[in-house]
Structures are given as C-alpha cells and as structure tokens.
C-alpha cells in the first residue's frame, strides 16, 4: 500500500538513461519522491540525507559499481534499505548481493509491481 505522504525520498542509480527515466516515472506516479543519478559518483557528490529512505541501485555501473557504493555507504554509517536491479545472471550476483542484505534483487526486465512492492517494504 502506497503512503499518501511518503516518509522520504527514494534514491535511484542506473546508468541506462531510458531505464532511469522510466523507473523514476514509475516511482513518482506511485506517490514517492525520487532523485535519480547516472552513476554512484554522482550520488556520492550530492550526498545522502536523513530524508532518503531507500536505494534502488543497479549492480553493474561504470566506475564504482552498485555493490561498492552500498559498501561505501555502509562504511560511512548510512545503512539505507537497498533494492538491487541488474541485467546480470542470478548466478553472477546471488552470493555477493546476499552479503549486503538487500530488501530485494530484481532482474531486468522486472515488473513495476515488484519494484513498488519492494519500495513499500523498504519504507515500512
């Protein structure tokens, strides 16, 4: 169930422009605030605030990858609930991602409902 007044902002990081726009739109239409970034470095340059409630994070990014970004945030004391999205095969990422305790791992192409359900769980 979507909150009428979401508790904060969803941070989205994906290097695919069209996917980033589509996912941002889906999140906004569901009633959530969202900030979207094309790279981990762009998110880190802005910084994470108390207003940010979860990450939707591509695993395979140029430069700093999604798993490295999650570890960097953990090391700085920012343990945001994370939903990983990826085009990689499950066998390539299941073990390493499990260690980061994500709310969900969604394999591209994923269903909008699965994404929004995961965001709801992250914000609960």
State each model region's role.
Residues 108:
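A Lys-centered signature of the CheY-like receiver
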Residues 1-11, 17-21, 35, 44-45, ...:
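Non-catalytic signal-transmission and effector/linker regions of two-component phosphorelay proteins
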Residues 21-29:
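Charged docking surfaces used in two-component/phosphorelay signaling
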Residues 36-54:
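Acidic, metal-coordinating helix/loop segments flanking the phosphotransfer/catalytic sites
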Residues 85-86:
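Hydrophobic/aromatic residues positioned on beta-strands within the core alpha/beta folds
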Residues 38-39, 65-68:
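Acidic catalytic/metal-coordinating carboxylates
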Residues 52, 66, 96-105:
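As written
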């Amino acid at each position: 169930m979507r909150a009428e007044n979401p508790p904060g902002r969803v941070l989205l990081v994906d290097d695919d422009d069209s996917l980033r726009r589509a996912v941002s739109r889906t999140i906004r239409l569901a009633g959530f605030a969202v900030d979207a970034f094309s790279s981990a470095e762009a998110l880190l340059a802005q910084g994470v605030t108390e207003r940010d409630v979860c990450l939707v994070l591509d695993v395979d990014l140029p430069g700093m990858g999604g798993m490295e970004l999650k570890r960097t945030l953990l090391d700085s004391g920012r343990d945001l609930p994370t939903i990983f999205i990826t085009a990689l095969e499950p066998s390539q990422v299941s073990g390493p991602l499990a260690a980061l305790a994500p709310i969900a791992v969604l394999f591209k192409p994923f269903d909008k409902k699965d994404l929004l359900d995961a965001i709801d769980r992250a914000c609960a």
